Design a protein with these regions (language model features):
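A generic structural signal for well-ordered alpha-helical segments
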Residues: 35-39, 63, 67, 325
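Conserved Rossmann-fold cofactor-binding substructure of NAD(P)-dependent oxidoreductases
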Residues: 1-20, 24-31
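ADP-ribose/adenylate-binding Rossmann-like module
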Residues: 27, 36-56
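Rossmann-fold NAD(P)-binding glycine/threonine-rich loop
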Residues: 32, 50-72
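C-terminal catalytic/substrate-binding lobe primarily of soluble NAD(P)-dependent oxidoreductases
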Residues: 93-336
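Adenosine-phosphate binding glycine-rich loop
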Residues: 66, 70-110
Length: 336
C-alpha cells in the first residue's frame, strides 16, 4: 500500500486496511499529523519514534478523547525516546508492592548521530515554552504543588549512591521526563497508581567526576547553540536527513538505563534495562517494532480491549511490551 503523506484521503484508505500503523518518518510535526488523524478516523492503532513533545501535546488536545471513545491506542515515542525511560520506570515500579515516591534514571549509551534528529531541531522554532514545561503532556489537574516543586529541569554533578558513577546532564531528559510523567498521571486515572506524589528525574551517568563535568559542559554548550539562531551557523557541519552512523557504529552501539527507586516508606530498589545496538537506529528499530507487534498481536493489553487514547508505552503496552522486549534480547534486571 502506498499513500502520499500529505493526502488525507490516501492516508485514510491506508489506515482503513490495517490494524496498526508504525511511523518512522520525522520530523513528525511536519509529516505525522495527517497520518495520526487518519488512524483515529479509520480505527487503526498507531506508534512512532518521535521525541517532539510539543507535537504530542497537539495530538492529545486533538485526538485523545475520540481515540479513547473508539478504543484506539495512539502511542508516540516508542523508540529510544522514550521507551527505556518509560518502560524501565514501569518495570522498576512493578517490583514494589507499595506506592513509590520517586524514580531517577541514569543513562549511558554509545552510538552515532542522526540526520533526521538534526532536521527535527530546525523545525522547533517557537515551541520553547512548551518544551520547557515539565508537565506539558499531563492531563489537566493532575499535578500537585509538591510534584511541581520536585520536577524542575536541572542537573547536578555528584556521585550516585549505589552506582559506580557520577550524575550529569541527561541528553534527552526534557523529552523523556514528560512522557514518564504522563504515564504516572494516566496510571493514577485508569490503572495501578505509581504513588500519590510520584516524581521522576533523568540524568546522564559518567565514569568519573571529570567526565561528568566535561560531558555536561559540552552538552550544555550544544543545547545553547541549537536553541538559538547560532544553530544556522553550524547547520552545514551537522548530519543531513538520510545521514546516519555506519553499520559498524550501529553494531557496536548500546544503551543502559539504571533506575533508582524509593518507596513512600523509603524502601530502595535499583533496576536496569540494557540493549545492544546503536540506540537511535538498531535499538530504536527493535523497540518500536516490538511496540507495533504488541498492538497487532496481543489480546491482553493493559486497560482491556476497549481502552484507548493518546497513551504512552507504559500505559498502553505495559507488561506485554516488557515481555516482548525480553524475548527480543533487551535485558531487564533487578540489581538489589
Amino acid at each position: 500500500m502506498i499513500a502520499d503523506g500529505g493526502d488525507l484521503d490516501a492516508l485514510k484508505s491506508l489506515a482503513s486496511q490495517t490494524k496498526v500503523v508504525l511511523s518512522t518518518a520525522g520530523p513528525f510535526a511536519r509529516y505525522g499529523s495527517l497520518l495520526v488523524q487518519a488512524c483515529v478516523e479509520e480505527g487503526a492503532h498507531y506508534t512512532d519514534i518521535t521525541g517532539e513533545n510539543h507535537w504530542v501535546r497537539g495530538l492529545i488536545d486533538k485526538h485523545h478523547l475520540e481515540a479513547a471513545s473508539k478504543g484506539i491506542r495512539i502511542i508516540p515515542s516508542c523508540g529510544y525516546d522514550s521507551i527505556p525511560s518509560d518502560i524501565g520506570a514501569f518495570f522498576t515500579i512493578s517490583q514494589f508492592d507499595k506506592p513509590v515516591n520517586r524514580v531517577d534514571v541514569y543513562h549511558q549509551a554509545q552510538g552515532g548521530a542522526s540526520g533526521g534528529t538534526t532536521e527535527t531541531i530546525f523545525t522547533m522554532d517557537g515551541v520553547g515554552k512548551e518544551m520547557r514545561d515539565p508537565f506539558v503532556l499531563n492531563p489537566e489537574n493532575t499535578v500537585s504543588e509538591e510534584q511541581r516543586e520536585k520536577s524542575k529541569d536541572g542537573f547536578s554533578i555528584e556521585e550516585v549512591d549505589g552506582l559506580e558513577g557520577w550524575s550529569g546532564v541527561g541528553v534527552m531528559a526534557m523529552a523523556n521526563t514528560r512522557v514518564v510523567r504522563r504515564s504516572a498521571a494516566l496510571m493514577e486515572q485508569n490503572q495501578k497508581p505509581y504513588g500519590k506524589n510520584f516524581t521522576f528525574g533523568e540524568h546522564g551517568l559518567f565514569a568519573s567526576k571529570r567526565n561528568a563535568r566535561l560531558a555536561s559542559l559540552g552538552l550544555l554548550l550544544g543545547f545553547i547553540v541549537l536553541s538559538t539562531p547560532l544553530k544556522y551557523l553550524v547547520r552545514p557541519f551537522l548530519p543531513k536527513p538520510g545521514d546516519g552512523p555506519s553499520q559498524e557504529t550501529q553494531d557496536k552501539g548500546w544503551f543502559r538505563a539504571t533506575f533508582v527507586a524509593v518507596s513512600e516508606d523509603n524502601d530502595r530498589k535499583i533496576c536496569s534495562m540494557y540493549g545492544s545496538g546503536d540506540p537511535g537506529y538498531k535499538s530504536t528499530a527493535k523497540l518500536v517494532c516490538e511496540s507495533a507487534l504488541a498492538l497487532a498481536r496481543s489480546n491482553d493489553l493493559p486497560g482491556g480491549e476497549g481502552y484507548g487514547g493518546v497513551l504512552t508505552s507504559a500505559v498502553g503496552l505495559g507488561e506485554v511490551l516488557v515481555n516482548r522486549l525480553k524475548d527480543a534480547e533487551i535485558e531487564f534486571k533487578v540489581l538489589n
